[in-house]
């Protein structure tokens, strides 16, 4: 859920923070690094030109026509900032670069309705790998700077339900594991962990179309830090008490 919220606020941030760059972007210019590389979101200003991931702007050339073919933008020091292929002003494939020359992100169309976006740390290590289906992030994995997986999620193609969602600490210990156990009935298992990696709680869940959310449903076990277990029964998201 936190990653879905992050994606939502990232989209909003792109639309607000970089609105001044877009609508109709002029001929290539040289950019100041501090103004285009956000410490959290990276070089996000070109996302407005990517219709495959929800962009709604067009890039024009110096004559006012929609850009066609390869375009490059640079930093003030002359290093490449952006290289992208445009069709009718829309990005089809592109790479952004840090001022040190390392790739900041790379986007490409894989097949009809399927595209891939990879983001990188300044040292070149993979930061995020996102596969979009029909404009929505279907498969998403984030990494820590040390290469460990921080978060990974897979959704159905129609984005109607989650297939799996897992988060990990920087040392690789699990924090939360949520995965489907019965695709037809939309039944799930969920496990939560303490910081030391010991199990904290586990039990079954189900997807409810009525509330469009996941509910505890069945016998849940909760563990204290010594490992002592207590059991609780849940039905349709409500705990049943005797």
Please place each PLM-identified region on the residue numbering.
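Glycine/tyrosine- and acidic-biased, solvent-exposed loop/turn segments at the edges of beta-strands
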Residues: 19-242
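Bacterial Sec-dependent N-terminal signal peptides
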Residues: 1-26
